[in-house]
């Protein structure tokens, strides 16, 4: 009986010892697992931090590249816009110049007709009623033609007593003058015209050589020049 109880005691001690060992092993395993878990968490945090750092670095590099590309495209846009604006202005200027050239050509062809009307008005002195009626008729046409020229921007030059300017005038004759200083226009032989501020036709003029100067042209040459002009008188400024 005593032996049996002794065995039971030993078995109980063994069970207790096993249970204690089991608990100790379990505690060790739990501690190890906790440490491993903490280690894994630290590693994960380090990996995440490294990845985040790399991502930020890559994004910064990409942002810098995009900013450079943006500046390049912006410069190209500004240059293209400026080129287009210059092209548009050049086209507009060329069109205006072409228009002026075409209008100038047409108007220049009309001016001799205007000169003939003016010459007829000054030279012809109709006496009969029929001749006066005819004279008034073509002078009415002349005034209409003058009005059309004005509407197109044509304006006559005023040259007498003005300083000779080769950009505006063509000196056909030169002679001494007690009234006008040298290079002052004495007489207008053919009217000059402006078109929108530009010279449409140069004025043919007689220019003073100043007092006491000798005429550089012989009378025959002077007569020839006046004959070449065909004794044309300029258009008057009145309607």
UniProtKB/Swiss-Prot annotation:
Q: Where is this region: Disordered?
A: 1-39, 207-239
One of the record's GO cellular component terms: cytoplasm
Composition bias of kind Acidic residues appears in 226-239
One GO BP annotation is: protein folding
The Polar residues compositionally biased stretches are 14-32
Keyword Cytoplasm appears in the UniProt entry? yes
Q: Which domain of life is it from?
A: Bacteria
Task: Fetch the SUPFAM superfamilies from UniProt.
Answer: Coiled-coil domain of nucleotide exchange factor GrpE, Head domain of nucleotide exchange factor GrpE
What Gene3D superfamilies does UniProt report for this protein, alphabetically? 3.90.20.20, Head domain of nucleotide exchange factor GrpE
Annotated family: Belongs to the GrpE family.
> What does this protein do, in the record's words?
Participates actively in the response to hyperosmotic and heat shock by preventing the aggregation of stress-denatured proteins, in association with DnaK and GrpE. It is the nucleotide exchange factor for DnaK and may function as a thermosensor. Unfolded proteins bind initially to DnaJ; upon interaction with the DnaJ-bound protein, DnaK hydrolyzes its bound ATP, resulting in the formation of a stable complex. GrpE releases ADP from DnaK; ATP binding to DnaK triggers the release of the substrate protein, thus completing the reaction cycle.
Q: What is this protein called?
A: Protein GrpE
Per the UniProt entry, what species is this protein from, by scientific name? Prochlorococcus marinus subsp. pastoris (strain CCMP1986 / NIES-2087 / MED4)
What taxonomic ancestry is recorded? Bacteria, Bacillati, Cyanobacteriota, Cyanophyceae, Synechococcales
